[in-house]
Amino acid sequence: LCEGDAVSIIEHMSDSMATRAAEQLGDAVDARVRAEVAEAVAIADYATAHEWHSGDPYDVIGTRPVRLGADGTPLLDEFVALELAALKQISIAAATWLIRDILNLRDRHPQLWQQVQDGALPVFRACQLVQEVARWGLDAGQA
């Protein structure tokens, strides 16, 4: 081997390593997006499993319904945020805000929710958008 051949081999190895690393990074990003979407859908499903319906009986002493989201979102069991906080190992306040954002996204902005599910819009960005819209105080029809 002459010096030029060694340099060429090293450059080729570096290029192939960089290509592999770029592919690994792309795969990791895709996996993260899929995981974030799956988590958002799971949170929405978890909230649905804890919905209160208008005919459901409740007592002042027992579990009560609460509305975590804005107008047009369902009433939920008051302990749903506590349970989600335990499952995700986050604070109750963070769980409450997360449920609020996901419910607002799913129930008040279905087209945006679909974009999130398709992976076209990051979950965090969609949550920022629904937080901003919620500040306007619109009812479900206006949102």
What does each model-found stretch correspond to?
Residues 1-143:
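Peripheral, non-cofactor segments flanking catalytic/redox cores
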